[in-house]
A protein has these predicted regions:
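Charge-rich amphipathic alpha-helical interaction elements
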Residues: 1-204
């Protein structure tokens, strides 16, 4: 801790700093709470996303029994090709994060007379699963970025609560004591000088 100047100017500076810290701390604490809430929201979204994937897998399993041979899964895979993953950006509690918009698939034609009628349903189910997984990756990235900001904000809250504010209050206390002692000493010296002067005048 830097050595404190024991002056009235330093006292004013420390008081001003304390006011600033105490004014800024609630904003940091609120941001910390918002970030914690958003992280919980991300976890809820991931849980819901995983439940949707499981439901889609169950729907796909219904078509698996219709696959007439070992080539059917490959025929489904051949009908699926990702063209683009659409994302944007969003601001969550002051954090810039990616936002999932969807997955675009290439339109791969097939011979409707050669393929079984259930193939389109199986393709749609697999596409849905892929889209759900891509969305989950984006949510996980949101969680990671929000977590980084939460760690930084928590460090700043701790710095204010445990270091800056207590340190500034202690500086104010030390300066006030020093100024009080100096004022007391000045009064004592003044009285001594006055008595000495009165004694000299009496002797004359």
């Amino acid at each position: 801790m830097a050595k404190v100047k024991l002056t009235k100017t330093a006292l004013k500076q420390e008081r001003d700093a304390l006011k600033q810290f105490e004014r800024f701390l609630p904003t940091l604490q609120l941001k910390k709470q918002q970030l914690q809430m958003e992280m919980r929201h991300c976890l809820d979204q991931i849980e819901q996303n995983e439940a949707r994937e499981e439901a889609s897998k169950n729907a796909l399993r219904a078509w698996v029994s219709l696959f007439g041979d070992d080539t059917a899964p490959q025929r489904v895979a051949d009908r699926i090709r990702v063209k683009a993953i659409r994302t944007g950006s969003a601001n969550i509690a002051g954090v810039a994060v990616p936002k999932f918009h969807g997955v675009d698939f290439e339109d791969i034609p097939c011979d409707l007379f050669l393929e079984e009628p259930w193939l389109d349903d199986a393709v749609d189910a697999v596409k849905q699963i892929l889209e759900i997984r891509e969305e989950r990756e984006i949510i996980r990235e949101q969680y990671r970025l929000i977590g980084q900001e939460l760690r930084t904000t928590t460090q700043r809250v701790n710095l204010f609560e445990k270091v800056k504010i207590p340190e500034t209050k202690e500086n104010i206390r030390i300066i006030q004591i020093a100024i009080g002692d100096a004022q007391t000493s000045a009064v004592v010296r003044s009285k001594i000088a006055k008595k000495k002067l009165q004694g000299e005048e009496g002797a004359a």
